[in-house]
């Protein structure tokens, strides 16, 4: 059984364990049926990523009247998500095999990161390589990683490609209680992966200012 979700936000999927797969089609428009059929019958490979987080239960979701950031969005979640921000599968088997920062890292310059992504499967597909950053020093930094770059890459079966990201030095900023933005930490961790920062098919690299 395949569950097809025509929704505008996250939803409760109580029967997910009884499903062989879940296809989230959002509101696909007039030609949505044809697009869904192409995916279901293998004419195309799915390659989208979640722009939101699916919580495991209502207890984990903040109240709509609560404006604090505690446990809100992927950047502040304290528990494991059901399906995290950035999650999404394809019909193939892709992974990031290498990731490295090019040149020196400083507070005044952008960060250049090169990643290698490979399609180890037998199906042509697109993959979205995602880059996240985390400040490991500042007490004002967000709890988890923050998305700082992504690129869609088309990969033939067995193909490997190199992808370069230019990450703004603003990605290293924190925001204090007065709304001021500045770089407070000296130790940052960059993560490049093909699923999301919570999954292991990725590479991490530590950088110091």
Predicted regions located by residue number:
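Single conserved hydrophobic/aromatic residue that forms the stacking wall/gate
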Residues: 1-13, 199, 206-209
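Active/binding-pocket-proximal capping segment
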Residues: 130-138, 145-147
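Secreted, periplasmic, or luminal enzymes acting at the cell surface/secretory milieu
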Residues: 9, 14-126, 132-134, 185, ...
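Short acidic/His/Gly/Ser-rich catalytic and metal-binding motifs that mark active-site loops
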Residues: 14, 140-141
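Short, conserved secondary-structure segments in the cores of folded domains
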Residues: 2, 101, 149-151
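Short coil/turn motifs at secondary-structure junctions
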Residues: 120-122, 136-138, 170-172
């Amino acid at each position: 059984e395949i569950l097809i979700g025509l929704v505008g936000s996250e939803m409760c999927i109580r029967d997910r364990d009884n499903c062989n797969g879940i296809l989230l089609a959002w509101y696909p428009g007039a030609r949505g049926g044809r697009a869904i059929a192409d995916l279901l019958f293998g004419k195309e490979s799915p390659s989208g990523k979640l722009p939101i987080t699916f919580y495991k239960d209502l207890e984990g979701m903040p109240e709509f009247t609560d404006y604090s950031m505690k446990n809100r969005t992927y950047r502040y979640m304290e528990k494991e998500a059901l399906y995290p921000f950035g999650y999404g599968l394809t019909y193939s088997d892709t992974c990031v095999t290498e990731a490295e920062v090019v040149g020196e890292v400083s507070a005044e310059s952008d960060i250049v990161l090169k990643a290698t992504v490979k399609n180890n499967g037998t199906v042509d597909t697109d993959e979205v390589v995602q880059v996240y950053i985390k400040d490991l020093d500042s007490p004002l930094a967000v709890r988890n990683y923050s998305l700082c770059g992504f690129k869609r890459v088309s990969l033939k079966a067995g193909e490997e490609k190199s992808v370069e990201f230019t990450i703004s030095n603003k990605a290293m900023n924190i925001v204090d209680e007065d709304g001021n933005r500045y770089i407070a930490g000296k130790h940052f961790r960059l993560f490049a992966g093909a699923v999301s920062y919570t999954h292991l098919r990725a590479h991490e690299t530590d950088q110091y200012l």
